[in-house]
Amino acid sequence: MKRVAFVFTHSPHGSTSGREGLDALLAMSALTEEIGVFFVGDGVLQLLPHQQPEKILMRNYIATFGVLPLYDIECCYLCEASVRQRGLSIDTNWVLDVELLAPKAWRSKLADYHSILSF
C-alpha cells in the first residue's frame, strides 16, 4: 500500500491552503492507513492553540487537527527548527500530538513516503 505524506507549509488563516489540506487529509484516510502529516515553515502555526480566526471572519478549522487520531492518523511530525525560528516554545501544548524533529530527521521521515502532497 502506498504511503502518503501531507506537508503543511503555510500559515493557517492567510489562505485556504491549510483547510483544503486538512479536508484532503481526512478524505485520504478512507483510502489508505499509511498517512504521515508534516509541518514545516509557517505550517507549524497550524497547530497553535487558542487561535481566534472568527475575528478576521475565517472558519476555525484548527481544532479538527485534534481528531486525526480518530481517523487512525498518528504519524505527525513538526520541524523543531521552524518552531524555534518563529519564536515559539517547543513545549507548546499543540492541538495535535506531534513528534518534534530536527530538520535532517524530519526530511528523513518524509523520504519514507511514496507520495507527497503539499499545502
UniProtKB/Swiss-Prot annotation:
SUPFAM superfamilies, sorted: DsrEFH-like
GO cellular component: cytoplasm
Disulfide bonds listed in the record: none
One Pfam family, short name: DsrE
Compartments where located: Cytoplasm
One GO BP: tRNA processing
Entry annotated with the keyword Cell wall biogenesis/degradation: no
This protein's UniProt keywords: Cytoplasm, tRNA processing
Predominant cellular place of this UniProt entry's protein: cytoplasm
Oligomer and partners: Heterohexamer, formed by a dimer of trimers. The hexameric TusBCD complex contains 2 copies each of TusB, TusC and TusD. The TusBCD complex interacts with TusE.
Job of this protein: Part of a sulfur-relay system required for 2-thiolation of 5-methylaminomethyl-2-thiouridine (mnm(5)s(2)U) at tRNA wobble positions.
Family listed: Belongs to the DsrF/TusC family.
Full protein name: Protein TusC
Gene: tusC
